[in-house]
């Protein structure tokens, strides 16, 4: 196990006057994924070590002994990352209300230096290693609360689905929920797979999906997304032809009705699919709000998570 290069930095976030302390550290995880269908009688698994940078913020109420501080995993979206050199703390940046409410908050760069890993298996493996490091080296709760905005919401949902034993609750802020397109009534909700336009010299989201999910011949391959496509994970089609999604824990979602990046129709359908399963979900739709985190979202997220500590 690789755990090294821990450093502590102090700087301000979000234009705040106050400075905060951040702990940066690195974990090593296995990047290998067996995506072939070979029948050869041989050991196929192997170790491909990669290093992932992580950021942890502790609240003023944190103590090294006594009651454990509740831990939140706050995953960043596709436009952010974690990098000590750049004072980039990923999803921790948007969780200051949680830190001020007594929660520790953790995020990871992702499975590649660019951080745009979009909830693929390696991203979750790296996040789990970071979680284990945090709870082993600090007085933090082993059961966690998980949040994320936009693509970070996609990562958060995937993490909860794959590690249900340690997740108490999900708080999703305008989450990306479908890799492939979904038709709801007469409305088509585009997936990340559909976003083929490249921006600012970068490859398109479509091409990023091909890369990180390792699609063969650059063609759609549903088998490579199983377990990592939130709307289709832990789900089935009911007798009425509607999808039923069974989340591993209670869920609350915040979604702006003027969002042009995440389709509010898709988010509503996701909430309804959870209700069809008889599971608990809350959905707060915000009129006049686009693809941005508002003070209302921050305050309610803290109140939502306080129910579970």
Where are these regions (language model features)?
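Histidine-bearing beta->alpha loop at or near hydrolase active sites
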Residues: 283-293
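Conserved alpha/beta-hydrolase "acid-adjacent" motif
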Residues: 260-266
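Short beta-strand/loop motif that positions the catalytic acidic residue
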Residues: 247, 253-255, 259
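N-terminal cap/lid segment of alpha/beta-hydrolase-fold proteins
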Residues: 3-66
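Short substrate-entry loop that stabilizes the transition state in hydrolases
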Residues: 65-66, 77-117
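Alpha/beta-hydrolase fold nucleophile elbow
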Residues: 138-150
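Alpha/beta-hydrolase active-site loop
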Residues: 118-138
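Hydrolase active-site cap/lid region
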Residues: 158-220
